[in-house]
Design a protein with these regions (language model features):
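Helical/strand "switch-coupling" subdomains that flank nucleotide/phosphate-binding cores, especially
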Residues: 84-88, 103-230
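Glycine-rich phosphate-binding P-loop
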Residues: 2-20, 301
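A generic structural motif
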Residues: 8-9, 170-172, 297-304
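Contiguous, well-ordered alpha-helical segments that form the cores/surfaces of helical PPI scaffolds
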Residues: 20, 181-188, 289-292
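Short amphipathic alpha-helical interface segments
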Residues: 174-182, 284-288, 594
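Alpha-helix N-cap/helix-initiation sites
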Residues: 12, 70, 173-177, 280-281
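Extended, low-complexity interaction tracts enriched in P/G/S/Q
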Residues: 1, 24, 29-106, 111-120, ...
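Active-site-adjacent structural elements in folded domains
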Residues: 145-152, 276-279, 285
Length: 595
């Protein structure tokens, strides 16, 4: 099941209902076929599948302008069944968590729900003392740039649900509290400040307390060195290692990059632990029902890196949908013996997909510029226009009338032309971490923090011992993994799975932007029907023969057109239908007769 739609259209709620239904159905089948024994175990598996939602929502959902509980990531959930139809487990894949929301929120938006749950006192005794956080969200910069309270959300109650979900899923006390402590650590990192010295590339710590709290939570004794590693990281110049002074802005940028990376790694760790609890090794997995919950096509006033990833994903999904319709149409026409020149509708979107995927396409250029140390937004823009403008029919100059006056280019997608702004794409595609700080974190006493950064190479000289005996090429290949390359690999894996299944498409629509029941904004709905591919599907159907009627029904309905001729056909329904259709002028190319 592919569930798509705009933010606030109901994707997450529909996904939860679908998952709950299949989980309960699988448990009922277990009880029917097994009788009384191990009912408790199977009910627990059902509960675990359902209870992944509070954790994923706490760490992956946030308030946006349009939706108080918006999923800021995509997910593909598999519900497994054995040969008897019994529930046999589950597995969750996640896509493209919005890391930038960790450190920045627009006005009237909010950070991830878990941040605001942790400042609530009561549901988890002693939590504030353990994580060293106050109960005032305004004490923390990373969570107070937008709104801090949402009328429709009771953060205290939600913390209780999150805590219970950890227990239901079988997280140990250590795992649960390590997750809370690491989340709090990220908030404390946001409070670290620096004072600029007289010289341009030099600064010093301002208030030592946030750094001390951060070090306490991650198990680092030398908090002065922790600050010092931001202020004067070790870098390689030629063949020599030197300490390079940083100005205050550089230090703050390094902290923000560390916070985003740490939160993303924490989120992926939580998903891995959820998957661990959903596996029942005693059950043989034969079939699965997959539910894909992912953002639909987005055309905003300001479109940036997140939108290009989401829209590329939707181009691929729409191509899959179009090709699927083509295959179904072809099968139907072959079954009915209808002669028709077949067109693979999936090829209609090929120009845009080629723009993204070809060897010197947009994604390849983004990868190249991301990994080149001296690249800038301007050099990236210049290279895109040099290689794509005028050479691809769908890569365009920014379109007039855009409210984003700083847009750099436009792409003609199936849902419409979208203007894109290139600002910060290189930064968003890879968070360049301060390797000196990461090396210190990898030696911390907090086992979870060490685990989260286990695959980060750190300083090359620190890794030299581990990499001894390996070829330099192999050792260096793992240094950087960009968001776009990881997302592209995930997307290819997802499409391979979808191509091996029998897909069903669910399109969710926002009826109006006022959250008012019973009100339908026709212009808004039409825009969404365009963006989620419904109109594209109608266009495809109209290129074939979209209306299918059985002969008996057609004869009874239209006999009035040629009553004598139809009655002369007797019981031959196909002949009667042909008589009626041939009497209509200039319509012979618009109908066919099946078996």
């Amino acid at each position: 099941m592919l569930i798509t739609g705009e933010s606030g259209a109901g994707k997450t709620e529909n996904t939860k209902k679908v998952i709950t239904y299949f989980a309960i159905l699988g448990a009922v089948e277990s009880k029917k076929k097994d009788g009384d024994p191990p009912e408790e175990k199977k009910a627990n598996l059902e509960d675990r599948i359902v209870n992944t939602n509070p954790i994923l929502e706490s760490y992956g959902n946030a308030k946006t302008i349009r939706n108080d509980n918006s999923s800021r990531f995509g997910k593909f959930i598999r519900i497994y069944f054995n040969q008897m139809g019994k529930l046999a487990g589950g597995f969750i894949d996640v896509y493209l968590l919005e890391k930038s929301r960790v450190t920045y929120q627009q006005p009237n938006e909010r950070g991830y729900h878990i941040f605001f749950q942790l400042v609530e006192e009561g549901p988890v005794p002693g939590l504030q003392e353990m994580i060293r956080m106050s109960t005032d969200p305004y004490d923390y910069f990373f969570m107070s740039q937008g709104k801090v309270k949402v009328d429709s959300i009771d953060d205290q109650e939600e913390l209780e649900f999150t805590d219970q979900a950890f227990d239901t899923l079988g997280f140990s006390e250590t795992e649960k509290f390590d997750a809370f402590k690491t989340t709090a650590l990220i908030m404390h990192l946001g409070e670290m400040t620096f004072k600029q010295k007289g010289r341009e590339e030099s600064c010093e710590m301002d208030d030592p307390l946030p750094g001390q709290k951060s070090c306490e939570l991650c198990g680092i004794e030398n908090w002065q060195l922790f600050y010092g590693n931001f202020i004067r990281p070790k870098i390689k110049v030629g063949t020599e290692w030197v300490y390079k002074g940083q100005n205050a802005d550089n230090c703050l940028n390094a902290i923000a990059a560390l916070a985003r990376s740490m939160y993303n790694r924490l989120f992926m760790w939580l998903v891995d632990l959820c998957n661990r609890t959903l596996i029942d090794p005693t059950m043989k997995k034969v079939n699965f029902i997959g539910v894909l919950d992912i953002a639909g096509f987005e055309i905003f006033e300001f479109n940036t890196f997140e939108q290009i990833c989401i829209n590329f994903c939707n181009e691929k999904l729409q191509q899959f949908f179009n090709h699927h319709m083509f295959v179904l149409e072809q099968e139907e026409y072959v079954r009915e013996g209808i002669e028709w020149e077949m067109v693979d509708f999936g090829m209609d979107l090929e120009a845009t997909i080629q723009l993204m995927e070809k060897p010197m396409g947009l994604l390849a250029i983004l990868e190249e510029e991301t990994l080149f140390p001296k690249s800038t937004d301007k050099s990236f823009e210049d290279k895109l226009k040099e290689n794509l403008l005028g050479k691809s029919p769908v890569f365009l100059k920014k379109q007039p009338g855009s409210k984003d006056k700083s847009a750099h280019f436009a792409i003609a997608h199936y849902a419409g032309i979208v203007n894109y702004n290139l600002s910060d794409w290189l930064t968003k595609n890879i968070d360049r971490l301060n390797d000196t700080v990461v090396d210190q974190l990898k030696k911390a006493d907090n086992a979870l923090v060490v685990y989260l950064f286990r695959d980060h190479p750190g300083q090359p000289e620190e890794e030299a011992k581990k990499e001894k005996g390996k070829k330099g090429k192999d050792a260096g290949a793992k240094q950087f993994k960009t968001v776009s390359s990881a997302f592209r690999a995930q997307l290819e894996s997802l499409l391979a799975t979808l191509n091996a299944t029998d897909p069903h498409f669910i399109r969710c629509l926002v009826p109006n932007n006022h959250k008012t029941p019973g009100l339908l904004d026709s212009a808004l709905v039409m825009h969404q029907l365009t963006c989620n591919g419904v109109l594209e599907g109608i266009r495809i159907c109209r290129r074939g023969f979209p209306n299918r009627t059985v002969y008996l029904e057609f004869k009874h309905r239209f006999v009035i057109i040629k009553p004598k001729e139809v009655h002369a056909c007797g019981t031959d329904l196909k002949a009667a239908t042909k008589v009626i259709l041939e009497s209509i002028e200039d319509a012979n190319d618009r109908w066919r007769l099946g078996h």
